[in-house]
Amino acid sequence: MSNLRQLPHRRLLWLAVALLFASAIAAAAQPYAATAKDDQTPKGDSRFTTLDGARIHYVNYGKGDEALVLIHGWTCNIDNWRDQFADFAKRNRVIALDLPGHGQSDKPQVTYSMDYFARAIEAVMRDARVKRAVLAGHSMGTPVARQFYRKYPDQTLAIVIVDGSLRPLGDPAIMDRLIAGFRAPTYRDAVGKMLAAISGPNLSADAKERINASALNTPQHVIVSAMEGMADPSIWGNDKINVPVLAIMAKNPFYGPNLEETFRAIAPKLDFQMWDGVGHFIMMEKPKEFNAAVISWLDKNNLLKK
């Protein structure tokens, strides 16, 4: 496999495959519980729209026909972005959604493809009367944002990649083994241990609890189907992203030396940052630094000015 085809998330896959064969640690699903920090988080306008008859939940901060749209990752939800709302909403309109199958959105028995998720974003933007957006995608949110750009290029101002991938997750054999673990009755153990392995040193106990609660309450059919969606080779083309792209990645030894080159081959207007001392959930581990980096980049590119 060439460097161009190596995954930015090799760390995640390597750990996940190994963990699927490790001894299981039982983990019970638990509902999201409010914490003291909830009182300090600004309250957005909670709304619902529909896609193919299913309700999609989102929160809105501010007004205007352009917005920063925050897209969470696999088995996550809006809560992952709670430390971004206050800082970002001071500058521009912000929308965060629960992708279908996640959070407060409906969880129908459908195929959870990246295309389906992209259509959900378009439905939210249409309901919110947002004409164009900067899409910030964490983890799985990156291929979702890219698929949105493919389908709705005129509605895409720019993309922010948060420890996400622009290349395939792995060869079919690896992906089949990974997905098989999530089909098993012990899937919650595999998900919980996988999340623990990719969490960084600065992630608070409260944040870990919220991440685990979200993941372990995501229905199994969503967990499996969304991972199958990320394994779909059709979403990993070499087609260019011709809008500005900011990539904030967590440094780790599995990325290799050519990650920036790999990204730039697809996204010529790339601003690439590799951060030391963080894990996969960068925006939760170092929220102030993350927020400042995104705002600085938005300012530099004259995006979403009020």
Feature roles, as predicted:
Residues 143-151, 155-186:
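Flexible "cap/lid" loop of the alpha/beta hydrolase fold
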Residues 14-26:
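Bacterial N-terminal signal peptides
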Residues 270-306:
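Catalytic active-site module of serine/aspartate enzymes centered on a nucleophile-bearing elbow/loop
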Residues 245-278, 284:
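Conserved loop-alpha-helix segment in the C-terminal half of the alpha/beta-hydrolase fold
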Residues 169-174, 182-240:
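Conserved alpha/beta-hydrolase catalytic His-Asp/Glu region
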Residues 45, 51-54, 59, 96-140, ...:
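Active-site loop/oxyanion-hole signature of alpha/beta-hydrolase fold enzymes
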